[in-house]
Amino acid sequence: MKKMSIVGAQWGDEGKGKVVNYFSEKFEWIVRFSGGANAGHTIYYKDKKYVNHMLPSIMPNSQSKGFLGAGMVLDLEKLVEELNILEADFPGMSSKFYIDLEAFLVLPWHKEEDEIIESMRKKPIGTTKRGIGPAYTDKVSREGIKLYYLFDEKMLKERLEDIYYLKSSLYGNKLKTSKDDVFEYLMKTKNELEKLKINYASAVEMGNVFRSTSVLFEGAQGVLLDLDFGTYPFVTSSSCMAHGVSSVGFSTFELDEVYGVLKAYTTRVGSGPFPTEIFGEEAHKIRELGKEYGATTGRPRRVGWLDLPALRYAKIRSGLTGLVITKADVLNGLDKIKVCTHYEVNGKTKDTPSSSYDFFVAKPIYTELNGWKDTNDINFLKYLSYIEEQIGVDIDYISYGPKTEEMCSKNDLILNMENK
């Protein structure tokens, strides 16, 4: 049975949620394998907008089920909120979701820590202040709380006692959240989840299920925000690449396809290097047409031209076998469109960054292509072909609007052009 992974090929916000929705009816399981409430995946169903930060992107009318894997850090309050929104419109939908008992939790003091640490930095790194970084830090330093602790109150209280002792020693009176506050929060959200009839499982239990059926693995953020290979330190705290499926007990060798999602241009939220960034009226126009404001933070996204060296880097790092291009319609009507083909790095021309260091010092080298009136224009097809030739991976699907149905295969696009 087919196994596919969808990952962001840029700095996140590429439209992965919509792409997952488009494919979801072909898969029995949609699995989130990393990240937390710092991701914002927007979907449209019957002209209504839903923004999921925690939940896998499955359509309400789909037979697919969703799994939240152990590589995530779960904000249970946000999870309950999202489930309640879906339940109000689609009663019983919560029972389609399963949570890995091995997943770590974002706790109230993690959000406090996020604020405290960001305020102490000489230069902010642009955290979403959702507690993601501190939660992953606790995971690595063995100070975290896993979901299964909620089902053993004695063990939970002992763990909270130990963790609070350390945190109060580190932060003193700056930390306002007590261990009792956290315990009450966890019991409250646990009860709310039980009322919603969400399911609990583990990747060990689900391993045979996943291997005997079709699974779509939904990545969060993008390759250039990956903890190991992104523009460190301006990155997220987890894996954004296909190899993140290991947190669900899978290997990348078990994946049949890895699709990278990219915009027809480039955006970035927060601080960090951005070689093709543009400013002024040109940037403002693209930002407004593309509604480039963060689904999680509402922050205006930085905007730039398409960056082919960054895409080549993403292809190599995440083993991309196909591409999906989104927001193609945003560039409609422009006479000329710039594309970065190479970087100049310390006086040398490079087609692909050697490491994430290159992003910090790169000067973009551009070529200029003819624009298009709409996505049925031959110049748009030439734009796609140019990207394919440069990257060495086919663009198989095109998104030209926010709704799930505003997407087609490249073959259908060509047929439509030929029939006009």
From Swiss-Prot:
**Which domain of life, per UniProt?**
Bacteria
Sorted alphabetically, which keywords does the UniProt record give?
A: Cytoplasm, GTP-binding, Ligase, Magnesium, Metal-binding, Nucleotide-binding, Purine biosynthesis
Which catalytic reaction applies to this protein? Answer: IMP + L-aspartate + GTP = N(6)-(1,2-dicarboxyethyl)-AMP + GDP + phosphate + 2 H(+)
Q: Does the keyword Metal-binding apply?
A: yes
Protein family according to the UniProt entry = Belongs to the adenylosuccinate synthetase family.
Task: Provide the residue positions that the database annotates as binding Mg(2+).
Answer: D13, G40
Q: What is this protein called?
A: Adenylosuccinate synthetase
Q: Name one GO cellular component term.
A: cytoplasm
State which gene encodes it: purA
Q: How does the cofactor attach, per the note?
A: Binds 1 Mg(2+) ion per subunit.
One short Pfam name that applies is: Adenylsucc_synt
Cite the binding residues for substrate.
A295, T296, T297, G298, R299, P300, R301
Q: What cofactors are annotated for this protein?
A: Mg(2+)
User: Where, in this chain's numbering, is IMP bound?
Assistant: D13, E14, G15, K16, N38, A39, G40, H41, T128, R142, Q221, T236, R299
The subcellular location is: Cytoplasm
Question: Which parts of the chain are coiled coil?
Answer: none
Q: Name one GO biological process term.
A: IMP metabolic process
User: Which residues are GTP-binding?
Assistant: 12-18, 40-42, 301, 327-329, 399-401
Catalytic center residues:
D13 (proton acceptor), H41 (proton donor)
Example of a GO MF term? magnesium ion binding
EC number(s) per entry: 6.3.4.4
Q: Describe its function.
A: Plays an important role in the de novo pathway of purine nucleotide biosynthesis. Catalyzes the first committed step in the biosynthesis of AMP from IMP.
Species the sequence originates in: Petrotoga mobilis (strain DSM 10674 / SJ95)
Q: Quick one: which pathway? A: Purine metabolism; AMP biosynthesis via de novo pathway; AMP from IMP: step 1/2
The record's section on CDD domains has: AdSS
Under the subunit heading, UniProt states: Homodimer.
